[in-house]
Amino acid sequence: MIHVVLFEPEIPGNTGNIIRTCMATKSILHLIEPLGFSMDEKHLKRAGMDYAKDCDIRIHKNWEDFVEKNPAEHYFYMTRYGKKAPSDFDFTKEEGDIYLILGKESTGIDRRILKHHQETCMSLPMVASARSLNLSNCAAIIVYEVLRQLDYPGLSNTEVLKGKDFLDTIED
């Protein structure tokens, strides 16, 4: 099971987009307080559309509360300070749940946490002049990298609204 963990997220639209990614991939979403928004904010609802009702969302009072409720050896941290790319990790060798931790939009994950977990810190390769990518894009990229390595377990690539053969019905 993949768990996406947002450390003190600030922007409701990003969290809404991540809710959509988590629902579509059967990933569990953990939100670590304080949050920079309320869970009923319109931007959160608009970005998450109607997916929130089908997404397993767990809210934690702080980092310590999250760790206490989710003791795991499989924490992976997405941070601009990571020295490895997600593809440098072999997620097929991980037994048990995989936790993908992303930081708040303004300052990331608390550096005191990162300091003790440098071997599982990762960053997305980009040009040297780019500081960062959007949080929800980073979440989608890393979730799908893990799923790619695991061969997309339990997921379908059939188009759900128009059917798998929709393109075959188009006349030239």
What feature does the model see in each segment?
Residues 1-172:
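Post-transcriptional modification and biogenesis factors for structured RNAs
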